[in-house]
């Protein structure tokens, strides 16, 4: 399963969906762009990114590099007026490349055409 940054952040903040997040982090993957987003938010809220990184990887969460193919698919997922950020589209593109479902807390992802299976954690 590909884990969106929103799911990891929900777990770190013990927000709704955090129980589901922990289950998926055990064998999940997160793209490098979303990994950066998680660590940036940790820093923004006063946490030590290195400590957060070690905690998350101790669950078995694997960080996967973004590829040129992911970049091309993310561009294909763009649509005028879309609420999807570049990091969102890269997460979806990673799911497509790996043939895995993507878990997020963002309900808007369910309406993405030509994307991977989306599971909403809340």
Give the positions of each predicted feature.
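Alpha-helix capping/helix-boundary segments
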Residues: 7-8, 34, 70, 90-91, ...
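Acidic catalytic patch
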Residues: 57-81
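Residue-level detector of structured alpha->beta connecting loops
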Residues: 25-26, 60, 99
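Acidic, PIN/NYN-like endoribonuclease modules and their adjacent C-terminal/linker elements
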Residues: 92, 96-122
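Short, well-structured N-terminal submotif of metal-dependent ribonuclease cores
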Residues: 1-30, 42-54, 122
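Histidine- and aromatic-rich ligand-binding microenvironments
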Residues: 3-4, 30-33, 84-86, 106-107, ...
């Amino acid at each position: 399963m590909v884990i969106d940054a929103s799911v990891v952040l929900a777990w770190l903040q013990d927000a709704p969906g955090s129980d589901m997040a922990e289950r998926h982090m055990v064998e999940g993957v997160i793209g490098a762009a979303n990994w950066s987003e998680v660590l940036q938010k940790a820093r923004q809220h006063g946490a030590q990114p290195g400590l957060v990184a070690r905690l998350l990887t101790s669950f078995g969460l694997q960080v996967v590099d973004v590829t040129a193919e992911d970049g091309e698919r993310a561009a294909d997922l763009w649509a005028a007026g879309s609420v999807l950020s570049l990091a969102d589209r890269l997460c979806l593109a990673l799911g497509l490349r790996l043939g895995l479902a993507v878990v997020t807390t963002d309900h808007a992802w369910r309406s993405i055409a030509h994307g991977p299976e989306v599971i909403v954690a809340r």
